Amino acid sequence: IQDRHYLKEPDQVELIPGAALALKRLMDQGCRLFVVTNQSGIARGLLTLDDHRAVQQRLQEILAGYRVELTADLMCPHLPGKGCSCRKPSPGMWTALKDEYGLHPRQSVIIGDKISDILFGFSSGLKASILVLTGHGQAEAQSLGLDTSFKGLYQLPPSPGGARPHVLARNLAAAETWISSMNAIGPGLV
């Protein structure tokens, strides 16, 4: 969705152009879709759990118009630095999803726009971490010293310690293209 600072109004939920169609193509290939999100605005008192639920409900409604269904969404409401096991990049949300849905890390990918998403993928042992340049992605990639002038997608050489993504993708459609080309993704796309 389009990034809005501490999004709490369902009527402000707006998809990034092309995102729903890319998600639909992934679903058509048998991928299950999950959302894992840090929502420290709840702990900060900037939004409530009900606000978050209303936003997620609106997202589900919009996606349903494209025949896209999220299998589940998990969120961490805690502040950074509070030592919880669920806040990305910690793997707590992955562990919960893996246990409940029988996911396998080597058949799962994370697509995100923040370094914490990428580190979450590494800490969870996922097959790949894809940084999209939408939302915060452009600034995050530049903070890692990565060239963002490419078109489509760019596969990076392995990174010791998982400090950078496996793949940079211009947007979700480019990420979907890479996943489709892998032909190794089974039952679980995070």
Task: Locate each region found by the language model.
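Asp-based, Mg2+/Mn2+-dependent phosphohydrolase catalytic module
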Residues: 49-71, 80-109, 114-190
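A short alpha-helix capping/helix-coil boundary motif
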Residues: 1-3, 38-40, 96-98
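Active-site neighborhood of HAD-like aspartate-dependent phosphohydrolases
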Residues: 1-34
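Short, basic/glycine-rich phosphate-binding loops at helix/coil junctions
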Residues: 1-3, 34, 72-80
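A short, structure-level motif marking secondary-structure boundaries and short turns
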Residues: 6-9, 43-45, 78-80, 102-104
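A short secondary-structure junction motif
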Residues: 39-52
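Acidic beta-strand-to-loop metal/phosphate-binding motif
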Residues: 36-38, 110
